[in-house]
C-alpha cells in the first residue's frame, strides 16, 4: 500500500509566511498577500485627515468666502492675504466676502490684511457677526463701500491701539513715537472709510466705544444691517 501524505490544514483566517497549495496545485503566496494588505491598510490609516472645521473653511473658500473668526495674528494674516491673492487670481471681477467675528489683535498683522484688501482688484464685501472689535472693526469698515454689512446683534468696538513699552529711555521715546504714528494712521484710514473727521475718530477712540449694528451703520462702519442672506444683492456672500 502506497503511503499518501496529506497537507497540513491551515486554520481559517490565519495567514502565515509559508506557501499553501490550492486545488489546482498552484502556490498561493499568502504571506506576500498578507503583507500587501497590511501595507494598504497602513497607507489609508496614516493619511493625514483635515480637521472638520478646516474642511468647512476650504469649502467656503471655493465660494469666495473667507472667515476671520479668531484673534488677528501673523499666521492668520498670512493665510487671509494668501486667500485674497488666490481668489483674485482665479477671478479678478467677482466679489470676495470676509465674515468677521474677532476680538482684534496685532496692528501690523491687521494692516497686512487691510493693504491686501485694497490691493486686489475685486470688491471685498465685509460682514460683522458677533463681535468686530479693535482690528476687527478696522477691517470691517475697510470693505468696499456699499458692501459692508452687519448682522442685527453684531457689536463693534473702536479704541486706540495699545501695547507695552520698555527698554532704555531712548528706546521708550522711539516706541512711543511709533505708537502715536500708528494711532494717527489708523484714525486717518477709519475717517476715510466712515466719512468722519480724523479729529472725531481720535476723540471717539480715546477710550473703548461700543456700537450696536444700527449705531455702526449710522457712524459709517457699515452700509447695511441685514437679517437674512436674501437681503444681500445677487453678488452676495455665497455665489
Please tell me what each predicted stretch does.
Residues 1-135, 141-239:
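N-terminal organellar transit peptides
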Amino acid at each position: 500500500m502506497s503511503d499518501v501524505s496529506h497537507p497540513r490544514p491551515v486554520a481559517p483566517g490565519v495567514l502565515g509566511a509559508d506557501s499553501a497549495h490550492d486545488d489546482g496545485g498552484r502556490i498561493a503566496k499568502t504571506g506576500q498577500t498578507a503583507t500587501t494588505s497590511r501595507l494598504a491598510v497602513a497607507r489609508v490609516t496614516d493619511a493625514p485627515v483635515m480637521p472638520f472645521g478646516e474642511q468647512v473653511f476650504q469649502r467656503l473658500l471655493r465660494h469666495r468666502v473667507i472667515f476671520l473668526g479668531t484673534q488677528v495674528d501673523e499666521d492668520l494674516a498670512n493665510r487671509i492675504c494668501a486667500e485674497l491673492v488666490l481668489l483674485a487670481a482665479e477671478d479678478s471681477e467677482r466679489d470676495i466676502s470676509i465674515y468677521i467675528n474677532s476680538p482684534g489683535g496685532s496692528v501690523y498683522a491687521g494692516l497686512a490684511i487691510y493693504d491686501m484688501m485694497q490691493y486686489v482688484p475685486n470688491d471685498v464685501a465685509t460682514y460683522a457677526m458677533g463681535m468686530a472689535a479693535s482690528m476687527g472693526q478696522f477691517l470691517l469698515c475697510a470693505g468696499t463701500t456699499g458692501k459692508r454689512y452687519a448682522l442685527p446683534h453684531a457689536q463693534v468696538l473702536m479704541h486706540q491701539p495699545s501695547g507695552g513699552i520698555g527698554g532704555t529711555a531712548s528706546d521708550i521715546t522711539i516706541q512711543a513715537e511709533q505708537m502715536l504714528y500708528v494711532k494717527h494712521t489708523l484714525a486717518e484710514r477709519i475717517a476715510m472709510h466712515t466719512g468722519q473727521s480724523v479729529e472725531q475718530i481720535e476723540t471717539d477712540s480715546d477710550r473703548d466705544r461700543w456700537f450696536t449694528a444700527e449705531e455702526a451703520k449710522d457712524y459709517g462702519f457699515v452700509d447695511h444691517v441685514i437679517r437674512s442672506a436674501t437681503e444681500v444683492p445677487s453678488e452676495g456672500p455665497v455665489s
